[in-house]
Amino acid sequence: ADAKS
């Protein structure tokens, strides 16, 4: 999964 902030 990609974590983007």
Curated annotation (Swiss-Prot):
Protein's name according to its UniProt entry: Major pollen allergen Jun v 4
Keywords assigned: Allergen
